[in-house]
Amino acid sequence: MVCRCPRRLQIDFSKVIQEITDDSGKEIEIEEIWKEFRKNYIDVGTSLKYLSHNISSENSSKKTNSDVLKLNVNFKGEEIEINGEGNGPIEACINALSELLHSPIKISDYHQHAISSGADASAAAYIEISIEGKTFWGIGINSNTVAASFEAIISGINKSID
């Protein structure tokens, strides 16, 4: 798998690695770097977990299309369905999760690319979110590009609450 991390994410992760090497006084192996990368950005926390989603497009009175999202998540051990609407699936997801958490969430940065090829190709989504003035990076990897984005958002949220 090849990750092409955005520059600000590289800077954020370099601080994690620097702290580890400063604490141990040793260089770390690539396996340990990958483990720390996953722990800090992909497999983050357990408070919120993506399960599935359903998106439909709707014409609103504003004569613009709007995405309506039904997002199924596990939140603190309970499976729930939350709903959001927005100008695209990511905005709809942010709106649904902001309502769930009673806190506005903003997207600060977003990148996505394929990490494999073929019919079953996977995508990596890198999303930096801002919650209450603090920023958090999350990464999602999924064969569904929308699900990868949702997973990245949720990883960032988990980093903020776990």
Residue ranges and their predicted role:
Residues M1-D162:
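Terminal or standalone catalytic/regulatory effector modules within metabolic enzymes
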